[in-house]
Amino acid sequence: VTKTNVVEKGVGQVFLEYQFKKALKKYFGTVRFDVILYSTPPITLTRVIKYAKQCNPSAMSYLLLKDIFPQNAVDLGMLTIRGLKGVVYKFFRRKEKELYRVSDFIGCMSPANVKYVREHNPAINPGIVEIAPNSFEVLSTREKIDWLGIRKKYNLPIEKPVFIYGGNMGKPQGIPFLIECLKAVKDREDCHFVVVGNGTEYLKLETWVNGANSKAISLFHHLERE
């Protein structure tokens, strides 16, 4: 659903709800939950959440709001509020409101997102909307890290400073802008740039990197967490 084209993604989100509910009944029918945790995308799991809450009346439902959809699709020009695309927007906007209503708490990625959700959804109790950033505190450690070994492992220059960009590579991340930034630094010899990630726009970035043949840029599809 998250790494497909726009049409397939939209159709997939519509049918995903039915598939999830069917799987929940089949494999977790006798399991009881204390917390029902789910994230966006997708926003089309309202019936699944309702069913899970009916089976687990004392469970708390918590929405991790990573994407504010469909508004982000409007911002990217993929949908419009009016016209034919507006029909699609209104369908998903209704789904979004339903998902908010069934959630006991809504965790947003930033204070700005909290403010946006509260302002554009006045029917929601503002007290249930809070910050739940998609990150964690990095613990200080005395463990010795073999930085030289890491650079050799990934064929990175030993003496140069390395700048790293990592994460999802989809439409919202503005990969064309990232490419423009890389164009501006591709001939630098005093530093090195590492790009790591995956998503619907990865191929576009990979094609450019291969064509640029820059010694200052390294692109990785995936790296181990440790």
Predicted regions and their residues:
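Conserved donor-binding/catalytic core segment of Leloir-type glycosyltransferases
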Residues: 151, 157-173, 179-183, 194
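Conserved donor-binding loops in enzymes that form glycosidic bonds
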Residues: 134-135, 165-170, 198, 221-222
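A conserved catalytic-core segment of Leloir-type glycosyltransferases
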Residues: 1-27
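Short N-terminal targeting/anchoring amphipathic segment
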Residues: 9, 24-45, 54-64
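Donor nucleotide-sugar binding/catalytic pocket of nucleotide-sugar-dependent glycosyltransferases
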Residues: 85-149, 219-221
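Acceptor-binding helix/loop patch of EC 2.4 sugar-transfer enzymes
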Residues: 2-8, 31, 59-93, 139
